[in-house]
């Protein structure tokens, strides 16, 4: 890999890391190409970026984007995106289904996060799920009132 290619990779990573709310670092050693494609497809569906990069290049991009404190060792795959829940969910779900995939660490909301925090975030409902729950709570009294009125109407009609 030439120096200009390395500079280009660092610039792209730096741009992506700056715009991201979450960066998750995972071990992918032993995963087949088919499984990596599955991860990439799942990530793409959730607007999450996935890339395998040398640690030295990733470290430079992380430091340049202000995301410091991550200890990078061994082989790593990086997942990042603007929505920290999506990134956490993609990583946690894939780890759950694949023994050889392991979440190592993350940088979320300006601080280094451990595996427990990533898994806790993955269990939280997404924004759309929260909105659906809220609408359901708001609609419950109206729905119950309507059911009561219909029951009263049916009772009056049967008399």
UniProtKB/Swiss-Prot annotation:
GO terms for cellular component: large ribosomal subunit. InterPro entries: Ribosomal_uL10, Ribosomal_uL10-like_sf, Ribosomal_uL10_bac, Ribosomal_uL10_bac_type, Ribosomal_uL10_CS_bac. Keywords: Ribonucleoprotein, Ribosomal protein, RNA-binding, rRNA-binding. PROSITE patterns: RIBOSOMAL_L10 (PS01109). HAMAP family: Ribosomal_uL10. Forms part of the ribosomal stalk, playing a central role in the interaction of the ribosome with GTP-bound translation factors. Belongs to the universal ribosomal protein uL10 family. This is Large ribosomal subunit protein uL10. It comes from Campylobacter jejuni subsp. doylei (strain ATCC BAA-1458 / RM4099 / 269.97). The lineage of its organism: Bacteria, Pseudomonadati, Campylobacterota, Epsilonproteobacteria, Campylobacterales.
